[in-house]
């Protein structure tokens, strides 16, 4: 999982990426291709 300061460019890497907020942190998840996961922080 990548840790980045801005998730906007990582959301555009794949059409199935979606942004979710869990436990106060913002994540990019992709259920079809797990290697596109990222976390902001």
Swiss-Prot record:
One annotated GO molecular function: structural constituent of ribosome
KW Ribonucleoprotein (keyword) present: yes
A single BP term in Gene Ontology: translation
A Pfam family assignment: Ribosomal_L36
InterPro entries: Ribosomal_bL36, Ribosomal_bL36_sp, Ribosomal_L36_bact
GO cellular component, one term: ribonucleoprotein complex
UniProt keyword list: Ribonucleoprotein, Ribosomal protein
Annotated family: Belongs to the bacterial ribosomal protein bL36 family.
Record protein name field: Large ribosomal subunit protein bL36
Gene: rpmJ
């Amino acid at each position: 999982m990548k840790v980045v300061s801005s998730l906007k460019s990582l959301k555009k890497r794949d059409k199935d990426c979606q942004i979710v907020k869990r436990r106060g942190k913002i994540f990019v998840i992709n259920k079809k291709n797990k290697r596109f996961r990222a976390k902001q922080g």
